[in-house]
C-alpha cells in the first residue's frame, strides 16, 4: 500500500509535500517511530496529518481507525469520503491507543490516524502470516479512500 501510494503521488504531484516513512522496531516497543519523533528530520509542527497503515490486510469487513475519537472532524470527513465513493464496508471509530507507530506522533501533538483492516485470514504475526495467504481484497478501495481523504483533508 505504501509503495503504491508513493508511486501515485510521484506521478501526481500535490501542492503540498507528502512524506513516506517506514519504521523498524514496532514489535520491540515502537522503537523506530519513537526515535523519529525525538529526532525528526522535519519539524513535527509542519506535519499536517499522519496516516499509519500498519496492518493493511484484507479489509473485507472494513477498517478500524485509531484516534477517530480524538479527531472527530477528520473522522467525519473520512466517513463522508467512504460514503460518497462506496469503498469499504464500514469504518469503525476507536479511541487513542499506543498500539502502533502513530502513537508517538500523537503524543507530540501531530494529528494522526492508524488504519487497520478487518476480516479475512486470522494469521497475525505468526508462521502462517505469509504474503501468499493474504488476498488483499480491499487493497484498491483502501488506496482510493486514502487518496480521496487526503484531497478532502488538504482542501482540494
Q: Which residues fall in each region the model found?
A:
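Generic alpha-helical secondary structure signal
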Residues: 5, 12-13, 40, 75, ...
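Predominant activation on well-ordered alpha-helical scaffold segments within soluble catalytic domains
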Residues: 3-7, 34-37, 79, 143, ...
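His/Asp/Glu-rich mid-to-C-terminal helical/loop segments that flank catalytic regions of hydrolases
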Residues: 7, 11, 18, 122-156
